[in-house]
Design a protein with these regions (language model features):
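C-terminal beta-signal and adjacent terminal beta-strands/loops
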Residues: 482, 533, 634-641, 660-712
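Gram-negative outer-membrane beta-barrel transporters
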Residues: 420-421, 425, 433-434, 521, ...
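Face-selective signature of the C-terminal outer-membrane beta-barrel domain
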Residues: 246-255, 288-443, 477, 526-532, ...
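Extracytoplasmic beta-strand/coil segments of soluble accessory domains associated
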Residues: 60-61, 85-131
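Transmembrane beta-barrel wall of Gram-negative outer-membrane proteins
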Residues: 185-187, 192-221, 226-264, 288-310, ...
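Structural signature of Gram-negative outer-membrane beta-barrels, strongest in the C-terminal barrel
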Residues: 245, 367-379, 402-535, 592, ...
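Short acidic/polar hinge/loop motifs at secondary-structure boundaries
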Residues: 123-124, 131-157
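Membrane-embedded beta-barrel scaffold of Gram-negative outer-membrane proteins
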Residues: 202, 211, 310-328, 467, ...
Length: 712
């Protein structure tokens, strides 16, 4: 019996990618239904270019022995998406929540970021067009990327981010920008809804020979569903490309984002039961805010001398100005009933400027049965400014001078070797070399805290992919994880002084299946992606809230922890006749995150992550562009402390989406939390919480949103 050749095997992977892209609402829609007066040549050429770009991303995914999800940015236009929590809703293994509906969100991938410093969102490396956005020390404190500025988002969970050079617990997320070559000449989006939300977005672009350019202006205002949670955001996103030759493309990206967001603060259980949407009193008196101005400039080039070789290179510079009142005055009456008035012992307003340089180099070569990818990421971050006393949102004297520096170099190589027909061996390694230099000077005493350390590790990976059918495959892999502490964690080391934390490290094993059914266009089509993983971690860095200075944290290394789980994404397109079909989609995650025979916490569950999280929808669609159906969320109970004494209740939500899509326009409406359930969205993590602990923030109540997009 003859066996398929390596070329046939690659074709099988591409077939899988194409079918998944055509059938999965998370990864792609089949395209706009043509209007009667549309130019068929223009429409076809546009779709061919977009699909070619998308299929390249999907083909890369098909050569990764682990959990990778591709989200099509076009799907964001059919529902209310204002932040990354909305955008990543259907990505299994990634748990995202917003405390007020604004940009400040909680995000965890495979159990990353489950502690009191969840505001820095470490454990996940963010990229934009392949260039690093996350700072050199690994934190994402100041901002997240705007998902509406992305053509696609690629989420590589855990060690599957090796092809991006990352080795951290949560993996990597890469947002790929649209260009004038894969977008309409002009688009206008208008949207709004509950809680005073008003959004507008205008995109214009053009192509002239070997030059192209695209500019987007974005505005979002919302009062928020809690008191003191208003957000005003203005953004400008632009890129220009030059096809210098048949082999060389160059592109420049520019971004400016100005976001001012009020923070409502957490509540006690009694306050939550009284009114879950009230603001914490100190959040109002302290005027808690997260105000960030961001400017970013990047250049990226692609050189493809032939079909078997491709070189990508790029540089980026980002400046972030942070103004962040976050702790109100903590007053202590030292003499009780005596004549002395209470004295302020602590308050906090952080005002810093953060500058990050980044660079990227990736070379892909196909050499016989080998598909080799080698790369380099470099980054350097300098944060300067101060920690001030907070007087109603105004600076009231400098407490600490901040001068933090970090740098990182990541080198990686991976070979996808077709060792036999239908079998691919994937092996490689990442090397990381990174430094931290934290300088915090107390103004009153002149004492300098100076934790400083260098970290290095070699992190190998080996896996295998077995093509089962032309449109399905199985995979397995074993990898090493490694993550150095952030500057936030070093400056909050529970030991104080100049002591430094150890880097987290461990090993993870993963197996899974992914694929799509292969049949006639009028048959039911299924697609699936499932992974099971187990990670044994040493020296995980966890932080608890500092009760002596609420709003700050204390960090330490934990001897052993376990991060294990099951991730599944399943969907279908079921014909009903008459041009109608049902498209169910289910994203399900099971988490088993715990301490491992810890001297203090034994085998307690890690906080913040639910045991299970299920999100999905059941859409009815027709060939004319109409769609409607329910959405649902089923989220299990979570612990709010390491001691497992404070349990946050599970919740279930029901929603509804409806819309209509045509060649030149589309409209949508969405109702969230249709039954108006009161539930906890995010919360602070303590060592041992009590009913009087102010840690709870409400999830979104019943809300209605609508949007209109016009294409010219």
């Amino acid at each position: 019996m003859s066996l398929p050749s390596r070329t046939a095997m690659r074709s099988s992977c591409l077939s899988l990618a194409v079918l998944a892209a055509l059938s999965c609402p998370v990864t792609a829609f089949a395209g706009d239904p043509p209007s009667d007066d549309a130019d068929p040549q223009v429409a076809t050429l546009g779709k061919v270019e977009v699909r070619a770009e998308k299929n390249g991303v999907e083909a890369e995914r098909a050569l990764t022995p682990g959990g990778v999800t591709v989200v099509d940015g076009e799907t964001f236009e059919q529902r209310a998406v204002t932040n990354m929590a909305d955008a990543l809703r259907y990505v299994p293994g990634v748990f995202t929540q917003s405390g007020t509906g604004g940009d400040a969100i909680f995000i965890s991938s495979r159990g990353s970021n489950l502690d009191a410093t969840n505001y820095d969102s470490n454990g996940i490396t963010l990229f934009q067009d392949g260039l690093p956005v996350t700072t050199a020390d690994g934190n994402n404190h100041n901002r997240f990327l705007d998902p509406l500025a992305a053509r696609h988002a690629v989420i590589a969970r855990g060690a599957n981010a090796l092809t991006y050079g990352a080795s951290n617990l949560g993996g990597a997320i890469d947002f790929l920008s649209p260009t004038a070559r894969n977008s309409p000449t002009m688009q206008l989006f208008l949207g709004g809804g509950s809680h005073g939300q008003v959004a507008a977005r205008l995109t214009a672009g053009g192509v002239s020979g070997n030059l192209d350019g695209l500019v987007t202006l974005d505005s979002l205002q919302r009062d928020g569903y809690r008191a003191h949670s208003r957000q005003d955001r203005m953004g400008l996103y632009a890129n220009a490309g030059w096809q210098a030759s048949d082999d060389l493309d160059l592109r420049v990206f520019a971004t400016h984002v100005d976001s001012d967001e009020e923070l409502a603060g957490p509540l006690t259980r009694a306050q939550f039961e009284q009114d879950p949407y009230q603001a914490q009193s100190s959040a109002i008196s302290g005027n808690f805010q997260l105000n960030v101005k961001t400017d970013r400039l990047a250049v990226k080039g692609t050189w493809s001398p032939d079909a078997g070789n491709r070189l990508e290179f790029g540089l980026s510079y980002e400046d972030q100005d942070l103004y962040h009142p976050i702790v109100d005055k903590v007053m202590v009456d030292f003499d009780g009933p005596g004549p002395m008035p209470p004295v302020e012992v602590f308050s906090l307003l952080k005002n810093t400027d953060q500058r990050t340089w980044g660079g990227m180099l990736r070379y892909n070569a196909r050499l016989g049965d080998h598909d080799v990818l080698a790369g380099l990421n470099v980054a350097n971050t300098h944060e300067s400014g101060g920690l001030f006393r907070n007087d109603g949102g105004q600076r009231n004297g400098l407490r600490t001078i901040v001068d933090n520096r970090s740098d990182s170099v990541e080198v990686f190589v991976v070979d996808r070797w077709t060792i036999a027909p239908a079998w691919t061996l994937v092996y490689g390694a990442q090397g990381v070399f990174t430094g931290r230099d934290v300088r915090n000077t107390d103004v009153a005493s002149g004492v300098l805290r100076h934790p400083k350390d260098d970290y290095a590790s070699l992190n190998p990976r080996i896996g295998v992919i077995r093509v089962l059918t032309p449109t399905s495959e199985a995979f397995a892999s074993v990898s090493r994880l490694y993550e150095a502490p952030t500057t936030f964690e070093l400056q909050d080391d529970v030991r104080g002084g100049d002591a430094t934390l150890d880097a987290m490290h461990g090993s993870v094993a993963e197996i899974g299946l992914r694929g799509a059914s292969n049949g006639p266009a009028d048959a039911t089509r299924w697609h699936w992606d499932a992974s099971l993983y187990y990670a044994a971690i040493r020296d995980e860095i966890l932080s608890i809230d500092n009760v002596a200075a609420p709003g700050t944290s204390l960090s330490t290394n934990v001897d052993r922890t376990v991060h294990a789980g099951i991730e599944a994404l399943v969907g279908a397109a079921i014909p009903l006749g008459g041009g109608y079909r049902i498209e169910p989609l289910l994203s399900a995650t099971y988490n088993a995150f715990s301490f491992d025979d810890d001297a203090v916490y034994a085998d307690n569950r890690l906080p913040a992550a639910p045991r299970h999280a299920i999100r999905g929808e059941v859409m009815v669609r027709n060939d004319k562009g109409f769609f409607a159906g329910p959405t649902f969320d089923v989220v299990g109970a979570r612990y709010a402390d390491f001691s497992n004494t404070y349990r946050v209740a599970a919740y279930e939500l029901l929603g509804l989406r409806v819309g209509f899509e045509r060649e030149r326009w589309e409209v949508f409406g969405e109702v969230r939390n249709l039954l108006d359930r009161e539930y906890v969205g995010v919360f602070s993590v303590l060592d041992r919480a009590s009913a009087g602990s102010a840690i709870l923030q409400a999830g979104e109540p019943r809300s209605v949103y609508a949007g209109l997009r016009l294409r010219f």
